[in-house]
Design a protein with these regions (language model features):
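Short pre-catalytic strand/loop immediately N-terminal to key active-site residues, enriched for Gly-Thr
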Residues: 11-12, 191-205
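Glycine-rich beta-alpha junction loops
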Residues: 10, 37-39, 81, 109-111, ...
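Conserved phosphate/ATP/ADP-binding segment of small-molecule kinases
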Residues: 117-191, 225
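Conserved N-terminal subdomain of the carbohydrate kinase-like
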Residues: 2-105, 109-117, 256-260, 264
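Short, small-residue alpha-helix embedded
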Residues: 146, 200-224, 228
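Charged C-terminal helix
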Residues: 225-269
């Protein structure tokens, strides 16, 4: 199996590609990358970071890949910094995704009830168009509300049901409720929920950890019903370890020591 991860590369602060590449690779799946931007650190709490938009470089990269005959079993998109980069993912799906391959979209746009700086209603509309082409979409609660055009207080079950208008397999992540954090997803025409205990605090990269492990699980042959509990438990274990061991949470999850147990569970050991 071969996965292409399309996301930004933050040199410091574990998120995006610095989570996707090790997590997917550790699961025995080839992971190639297409960086959408290069940052000195991620933007969650750091000041003075550098940002290099790589949009203009992407066509040259893809032109060379075409000469190599590259194709992918999964294309997994995360942070896309412009509407043009959404078009790039659509092009990748058309030109580089194998027959029967899957497009997994993590529609990174916002959190805590608002869009991230620089994201506009026009971008949201374009992201909806991408989600309509995707096999799996993994928004957090805020992103799910913007995609479905429902109020921010909408519950996870309603959001997952509403998002079926966009994609056959919506997976709403990070829904906090009654001391638990829940994932809502569609399975056999029913909205299902998987919950784990909430750990107080904000943990950068948690969404990337869940999405990357989910892609790895699918690539390893797991069904959505099998993958979501495994990936939710893996993400929770990473968060709990980080709460104990990481003083400055901006630097991301301590996921490395949880990878081996996760891989063993994927293999059924």
């Amino acid at each position: 199996m071969r996965v292409l991860a399309v996301n930004d590369l933050s040199c410091v602060g574990k998120c995006s590609l610095t989570v996707a590449l090790p997590v997917i690779s550790a699961c025995g799946v080839t992971c190639d990358v297409l960086p959408t931007a290069l940052l000195s650190t991620h933007t969650g709490g750091f000041e003075g970071y550098t940002f290099l938009d790589l949009t203009s470089e992407l066509p040259s990269i893809l032109k060379q890949w075409k000469t190599l005959g590259l194709t992918f079993d999964f294309i997994y998109s995360g942070y896309l910094g412009s509407e043009s980069q959404i078009d790039t993912v659509l092009f990748l799906q058309k030109e580089f995704l194998k027959a029967g391959g899957k497009l997994v979209v993590d529609p990174v746009m916002g959190d805590a009830g608002k869009l991230y700086d620089g994201f506009t209603p026009s971008f949201v509309q374009k992201m909806r168009a991408l989600c309509k082409k995707a096999d799996y979409v993994l928004p957090n609660r805020t992103e799910a509300c913007f995609l479905s055009e429902l109020p921010l207080e909408t519950d996870g079950k309603t959001l997952a049901a509403a998002l079926q208008k966009l994609t056959p397999c919506p997976i709403v992540t990070g829904v906090e409720e009654e001391g638990e954090i829940s994932v809502y997803y569609q399975s056999e025409n029913t909205v299902r929920r998987y919950a784990t205990p909430t750990t107080q605090g904000f943990f950068c990269g948690a969404g990337d950890g869940f999405a990357s492990s989910f892609v790895a699980a699918l690539a390893g042959g797991k069904t959505i019903e099998e993958a979501i509990p495994l990936c939710a438990e893996f993400t929770t274990a990473c968060i709990e370890r980080s709460a104990r061991e990481v003083e400055d949470k901006r630097y991301g999850l301590n996921f490395e020591k949880e990878l081996f147990p996760f891989v063993k569970k994927l293999k059924g050991e």
